[in-house]
Amino acid sequence: LDSMSRYNYGNEDTQLEVGEKVSYFYSATRRAYMENLLKSLDGRSVQIQGSNPARGNLSMDFYRGYPTGKSTYLDEVLGEKFRITEPLEQPKWDIIADSTKQILNYDCQMARCTFKGRIWTAWFTADIPLDNGPWKLYGLPGLILRAYDSKQQYIFDCVGMKQAKE
């Protein structure tokens, strides 16, 4: 498979959960689908084939910092489940001076990097001092609220935030 080829995943809700030592990025669409499916099965079994937009197209889960100093990527391809654990690789960002805009009422600044074969642009806010973001994008002096690759095959937009319950 060519990860640089054009594949349209469509729009999908993803979620980034940030803890003190670990962050978790996943498809919220897929998680909601699976939770509803499990509730409806009530002990029965079912076989699912083909693509269903309601269940989400992204099957990956990504943990940064688990285990410590590493990242863990979980995915499913053609029914086979995979787990890849590797050392953390931090993108080498160039912060673009005099580039600002507002996202969700936060002042954001632009940064760029080449990472995993793509040129990425990210907008981060120093108002939320977490060096985190979607997928494997992190390492800026604030939370990434928008990121996209130069071909705009992947676009991550933060549409809301909430504080988790303790």
Language model feature labels by segment:
Residues L1-K101, D107, W120-T121, Q152-E166:
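Extracellular or lumenal secretory-pathway regions
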Residues I103-L104, F115:
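Structural motif
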Residues R112-K165:
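Gly/Pro-enriched, hydrophobic low-complexity segments
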